């Protein structure tokens, strides 16, 4: 089992990534939604936004992502990736993450994302927050969101450090209309949204 020290974590500054899910050469709508959300996060961090797209004969659909705000796309095209397999996709994504080192990675809360996200997080020894309904980096904006939409005590909200660059996430709590803030250890931050 590997562990990361602060120097290792500092190396993970390769932008915000979105796992772009496709099936039989058709991009899933969740991918476009996450590209849009990822664009906001990348802008807040002052970094680039990249999609990561796996499959076979997918070069054509990779071009679609630029129109939705991606600065680039990592395309992993191989016959063995034509259909989703847990082990294959996990290996390719984790190997690519370790090579290019994104700061944040978003994965859709689809059937594939719910299978893939936890496996990648475990293999990369990082945190994962599922079913996110709000993502933010900008601390003042996030505090305002929490004040307006959560039942947290103001002292808890005010206790969030202003210099915190980590991804802030909000997810449903207790199966009802309430929500709870969440955070994961630094790098790479995975959030099925």
Question: What is the predicted function of each stretch?
Answer:
Residues 1-193:
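N-terminal glycine-rich FAD/FM-binding segment characteristic of electron-transfer flavoproteins
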